[in-house]
Amino acid sequence: MKSIEVDEELYRYIASQTQHIGESASDILRRLLMVPAEQQLEVVVPVRPKGIIVSKDAGNEHKLDRVKEMRTLLISDEFAVQGKAIGRFMMILSSLYRIDSDGFIEAAAIKGRTRVYFADNEEALLASGKTTKPKAIPETPYWVITNTNTDRKRQMVDQLMVKMNYNTDIIEKVCGVI
């Protein structure tokens, strides 16, 4: 086994291409370069003692960044001055969308027993109940119902974050401050 040194940007790209836990850097590169496993390329690569090794944890940096972003929100001055749960709720939703819009879109399909919680227009929320008090989530194309109690808002954020694959620790912290 040879080792090579790669810059940080290339390392992150290779790590992001991991398809399953335990996949080696050789497997990833072979797949990306479409080289069959049997074919041996004769390439001379200088050996350097401190190469970067792609591991099963390499792809987790994205998740750490998401957690860092949420923690940064929770300790921000802008968040701290929100006097009401609705303000904190809207900031959290806006941040979740900004951090991972694709994950948010997928997760926003959650519904209650009788209500739709999120929609891309006010009318869809009003159709599920005239007293839903829909509000646009800042800096997103989404609307959310707001005439729920604080516990229901926590449940909505909890369900959203679970579907977006956040870990339990950050979900509890975020829901605890609504």
From Swiss-Prot:
Stored Pfam families: SeqA (PF03925), SeqA_N (PF17206)
Q: Name one GO cellular component term.
A: cytoplasm
Per the record, the GO terms for biological process are: negative regulation of DNA-templated DNA replication initiation; regulation of DNA-templated transcription
Question: Where does it reside?
Answer: Cytoplasm
Please list the disulfide bridges: none
Q: What GO molecular functions are on record for this protein?
A: DNA binding
Q: Which UniProt keywords apply?
A: Cytoplasm, DNA replication inhibitor, DNA-binding
| Statement: the UniProt record of this protein carries the keyword DNA-binding | yes
The residue ranges crossing the membrane are: none
Q: Which domain of life is it from?
A: Bacteria
Region entry Interaction with DNA, spans: 113-117
What the entry lists under SUPFAM superfamilies is as follows: Replication modulator SeqA, C-terminal DNA-binding domain, Ribbon-helix-helix
What function is annotated for this protein?
Negative regulator of replication initiation, which contributes to regulation of DNA replication and ensures that replication initiation occurs exactly once per chromosome per cell cycle. Binds to pairs of hemimethylated GATC sequences in the oriC region, thus preventing assembly of replication proteins and re-initiation at newly replicated origins. Repression is relieved when the region becomes fully methylated.
Q: Which NCBIfam families match?
A: PRK11187.1
What quaternary arrangement does the UniProt entry report? Homodimer. Polymerizes to form helical filaments.
Tell me the protein family, please.
Answer: Belongs to the SeqA family.
- Protein name, entry field: Negative modulator of initiation of replication
Annotated source species: Photobacterium profundum (strain SS9)
